[in-house]
Amino acid sequence: MVVRIYNPCTPGTRHRSVNDFSGVANSKYRKNLSFFLHRSKGRNNRGVITNRNLGGGHKRLFRKIEFKRDKFSIFGKVLSIEYDPNRSSRIALVIYSDGIKRYIIQPLNLVIGNKIISDFHTTIDIGNALPVNFIPLGTLVHNVEFKPGNGGKIARAAGAFSKIIAKDKNFVSLSMPSGETRLIENSCWATIGQVGNLDFYNVILGKAGRNRWLGNNPSVRGIAMNPCDHPHGGGEGRSPIGRSKPLTPWGKIALGKRTRKPKRYSNKYILSRK
């Protein structure tokens, strides 16, 4: 994937760059593998805003991604690499030998014509899925399950990967994308390889409107508000926040405060925090 840079013809194109979508299929979405999903736009079930910086954006159809690779011992062939507006990675359309078509997250270096399989004992090739207990140490994996049978949750964004560090009788030590080291059950499934589309993080939006197309609302600084709206607000001119540490709009510590519950049951599975 190559990043294409625009000429500075207008202020909006001065620093703008886009993926050139080379290798991405031009075909229309598959109706049987896509559906409309109501987007919450930062609201909860009562309609109250819980995320102030979400809303708007272009209409999207959600693609049915096979996070749970349950087509065991059946070979699949990659038909095409497609764009998915709902995620940073690309998706690969796979047709299995029984005729079923499904989408999976495209790993790095997975190209059209490659064959993949989900099995307990298979080769360590890009795109193959198997339990982490059968994956060699040091292997890069993605789409890793937190709990057996729940489908992949870990390392699904563009360029993300986890690494198998150590193995025990019932658990496997995993290096998370955040830098955290965590134990997961050895019966959890994972897919071999790193997620593709590494150039996603090199793209510069170039203008505020392009961010609005993605459904992101502007984020207003607290120091630009009034005292009644934010703890950082008020003051004469460009004044400091007037606090010993930055605070959220609701008066809680904004930076460095641990937010994980100290008695959460899964704390015992975290070997080292990020």
Swiss-Prot record:
Region annotation Disordered: where it falls in the sequence = 230-252
Which GO molecular function entries does the Swiss-Prot or TrEMBL record give? Answer: RNA binding; structural constituent of ribosome; transferase activity
The protein's location, in the record's own words, is: Plastid
Q: Name where it mostly resides.
A: plastid
- Top-rank taxon: Eukaryota
Query: Assembly and partners?
Result: Part of the 50S ribosomal subunit.
Q: What is this protein called?
A: Large ribosomal subunit protein uL2c
Q: Which organism is it from?
A: Euglena longa (Euglenophycean alga)
Its gene? Answer: rpl2
